[in-house]
């Protein structure tokens, strides 16, 4: 089995531990500059790290809900349902020195893939790390499609198991800032 690895993000300004089987989507298609996107080699799971403008008009768990609903709007979700929102313990984060508050949200969105009519429920886990000194909301998303959506999980592909919530938590807690200049001049 392929080990987890520390991966540079945003040109080395950040790094994080990615789970086994993570493929950098920017090697396959264009990805916006404010995002790092990774997909599982076998399943349809994906991990997204986004640098977003701080949404100072929402605070606490409402900020996590705001970003979840915003993602639903961008994806033209037919239904958006928040299941849980909980604070993240800052001491567990590599970014604890610059993260003022952090939230983890789990929910479902009913979305149709590109060029498909049928919308299916996808489970999303999101971590919101708020960095007000950089005017930034860092949003990490773990997309978990339903099992029947997962690409060919035959015996030949069992060497790379589907990602777990633990893999996502490792990404969130290991995310490290190396170069604050990514946020522009202070």
Curated annotation (Swiss-Prot):
Region annotation Interaction with RAN: where it falls in the sequence: 27-70
Cell compartments where the protein resides: Nucleus; Cytoplasm, Perinuclear region; Cytoplasm; Cell membrane
GO molecular function list: guanyl-nucleotide exchange factor activity; small GTPase binding; sodium channel regulator activity; transmembrane transporter binding
Pfam family, one: Mog1
Family matches, as InterPro entries: Mog1, Mog1/PsbP_a/b/a-sand
CDD domains: Mog1
Main location, first listed in the record: nucleus
An annotated GO cellular component: plasma membrane
Record membrane topology: Peripheral membrane protein
Keyword set, alphabetical order: Cell membrane, Cytoplasm, Guanine-nucleotide releasing factor, Membrane, Nucleus, Protein transport, Transport
GO biological process, one term: regulation of membrane depolarization during cardiac muscle cell action potential
Family to which the UniProt record says this protein belongs: Belongs to the MOG1 family.
Role this protein plays: May regulate the intracellular trafficking of RAN. Promotes guanine nucleotide release from RAN and inhibits binding of new GTP by preventing the binding of the RAN guanine nucleotide exchange factor RCC1. Regulates the levels of GTP-bound RAN in the nucleus, and thereby plays a role in the regulation of RAN-dependent mitotic spindle dynamics. Enhances the expression of SCN5A at the cell membrane in cardiomyocytes.
Quaternary structure note: Monomer. Interacts with RAN, both RAN-GTP and RAN-GDP. Competes with RCC1 for a common binding site on RAN and thereby inhibits RCC1-mediated nucleotide exchange. Forms a complex with RAN-GTP and RANBP1. Interacts with the cytoplasmic loop 2 of SCN5A.
Protein name per the record: Ran guanine nucleotide release factor
Species annotation: Bos taurus
Name of the gene: RANGRF
